[in-house]
């Protein structure tokens, strides 16, 4: 019977859960604020992990840089806590990266909404029939 997910994918999923809990409950750095772990990519040899995070108040790029730097500074502590929570021979070295896909998705959604609204207004002004 074939495995649905590789070991690296399973480790990445479990690490995502554990890192989110650790950041929420254990890391007490005020620079981080409300962080969400949106994904984890683990190397094939499980030596390195890239952690993608988003922040609740990510309007200012400077605040995002400060928060990512704070997470990177706390990576040793987070790695130690992962080692206690998960049974791994080697706990991956963590690298934190800001995930702007949520912000980009919202921006694209707003652009589409504006185009549809403008098109509807233009059609109502000119009296054209709506064509789908």
Swiss-Prot record:
Main location per the UniProt record: cytoplasm
Keyword Cytoplasm: yes
Keywords on record: Cytoplasm, Ribosome biogenesis
Function, in words: One of several proteins that assist in the late maturation steps of the functional core of the 30S ribosomal subunit. Associates with free 30S ribosomal subunits (but not with 30S subunits that are part of 70S ribosomes or polysomes). Required for efficient processing of 16S rRNA. May interact with the 5'-terminal helix region of 16S rRNA.
Entry protein name: Ribosome-binding factor A
Oligomer and partners: Monomer. Binds 30S ribosomal subunits, but not 50S ribosomal subunits or 70S ribosomes.
UniProt xrefs under HAMAP family: RbfA
Family (UniProt): Belongs to the RbfA family.
Gene: rbfA
Compartments (UniProt record): Cytoplasm
GO BP term, pick one: maturation of SSU-rRNA
Highest taxon above the source species: Bacteria
Pfam families named in the record: RBFA
Database matches in InterPro entries: KH_dom-like_a/b, RbfA, RbfA_dom_sf, Ribosome-bd_factorA_CS
A single GO molecular function term of this UniProt record: ribosomal small subunit binding
A GO CC annotation given for this chain: cytosol
């Amino acid at each position: 019977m074939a495995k649905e997910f590789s070991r690296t994918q399973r480790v990445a999923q479990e690490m995502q859960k554990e890192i989110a809990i650790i950041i929420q409950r254990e890391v007490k750095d005020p620079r981080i604020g409300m962080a969400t772990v949106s994904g984890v990519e683990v190397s094939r040899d499980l030596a390195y992990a890239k952690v993608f995070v988003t922040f609740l108040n990510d309007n200012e790029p400077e605040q995002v840089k400060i928060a990512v730097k704070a997470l990177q500074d706390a990576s040793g502590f987070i790695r130690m806590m992962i080692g206690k929570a998960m049974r791994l021979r080697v706990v991956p070295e963590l690298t934190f990266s800001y995930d702007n896909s949520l912000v980009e998705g919202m921006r694209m959604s707003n652009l589409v909404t504006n185009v549809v609204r403008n098109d509807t207004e233009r059609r109502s002004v000119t009296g054209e029939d709506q064509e789908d």
